[in-house]
Swiss-Prot record:
One of its GO terms (molecular function) is metal ion binding. This is Serine/threonine-protein phosphatase 4 catalytic subunit B. Binds 2 manganese ions per subunit. Its cofactor is Mn(2+). Disulfide bonds: none annotated.
Length: 307
């Protein structure tokens, strides 16, 4: 099947942090769209699975993640969004994850983060990177169209709810999430926005978020949500934690962060969460990829885009 060998070649290229051609990006996005459009707003995922937080274009650290966590398709992965922006390799990072999704659709689940948005990527780097590497905004346009198709959340074995940011005062049940029309740019407010922007906070009820979008939500809100939906815990990303992961509210909410030495200067470690078939948890902590394994982006990259 020529399609698969083409795809495998593209995956190999992307694994080496080499760009694929613009027309290949177009075809890849078209295939990805066909797969993603079938997924639910609350995508069902079966254990065993390894859950990952923000990556933010840190390609060599994503390779390190695969080194410590196992490769696709041997390991089943769930990535909770924020694939792009801030790091140097958003293009290669997102396209590799997308190519793996198309090649092994049942072994990798990608859900949307607040950075999977046209507006945010124009400010935090992905737009400029696409322009620099391809000489036009076409690839950015293909990718941002795919962002609109990404699922908003996932549920592992019916028990662990995974979302990029957190809860929303407009949402009490998973069924209410299922009714959202997700195929759009992330709105400035409302339930879809809240899922991607909110944060847990040591408070009760709802609070105003300093981020200017989403809400702060307290332990009582979580207890109510988890009981109403018969789930054990909420797993989310969205916030840098220096130790790679952090428990909140008596282990009912977990933050997982998977970008080590964030922005190449924060000095944090990263974590991924391995869940076995009984949902037993094991955290794998990892550090930034050693300096010698990363091509530090030169000031004037060679063959930066395809004419």
């Amino acid at each position: 099947m020529g399609d698969m060998s083409d795809l495998d070649r593209q995956i190999d290229q992307l694994r080496r942090c080499e760009l694929i051609k613009e027309n290949e990006v177009k075809a890849l996005c078209a295939k990805a769209r066909e797969i993603l459009v079938e997924e639910s707003n609350v995508q069902r995922v079966d254990s065993p699975v390894t859950v990952c937080g923000d990556i933010h274009g840190q390609f060599y650290d994503l390779k390190e993640l695969f080194r410590v966590g196992g490769d696709v398709p041997e390991t089943n992965y769930l990535f909770m969004g924020d694939f792009v922006d801030r790091g140097f390799y958003s293009v290669e990072t997102f396209l590799l994850l997308l190519a793996l999704k198309v090649r092994y659709p049942d072994r990798i689940t990608l859900i949307r983060g607040n950075h999977e948005s046209r507006q945010i990527t124009q400010v935090y780097g992905f737009y400029d990177e696409c322009l620099r590497k391809y000489g036009s905004v076409t690839v950015w346009r293909y990718c941002t169209e795919i962002f609109d198709y990404l699922s908003l959340s996932a549920i592992i074995d019916g028990k662990i709810f995974c979302v990029h940011g957190g809860l929303s005062p407009s949402i009490q049940t998973l069924d209410q999430i299922r009714t959202i029309d997700r195929k759009q740019e992330v709105p400035h407010d409302g339930p879809m926005c809240d899922l991607l922007w909110s944060d847990p906070e040591d408070t009760t009820g709802w609070g105003v978020s300093p981020r200017g979008a989403g809400y702060l939500f307290g332990s009582d809100v979580v207890a109510q949500f988890n009981a109403a939906n018969d789930i054990d815990m909420i797993c989310r990303a969205h916030q840098l934690v220096m130790e790679g992961y952090k428990w909140h509210f008596n282990e009912t909410v977990l933050t997982v962060w998977s970008a080590p030495n964030y922005c190449y200067r924060c000095g944090n470690v990263a974590a991924i969460l391995e869940l076995d078939e009984h949902l037993q948890k094991e955290f794998i902590i990892f550090e930034a990829a050693p300096q010698e394994t990363r091509g530090i982006p030169s000031k004037k990259p060679v063959a930066d885009y395809f004419l």
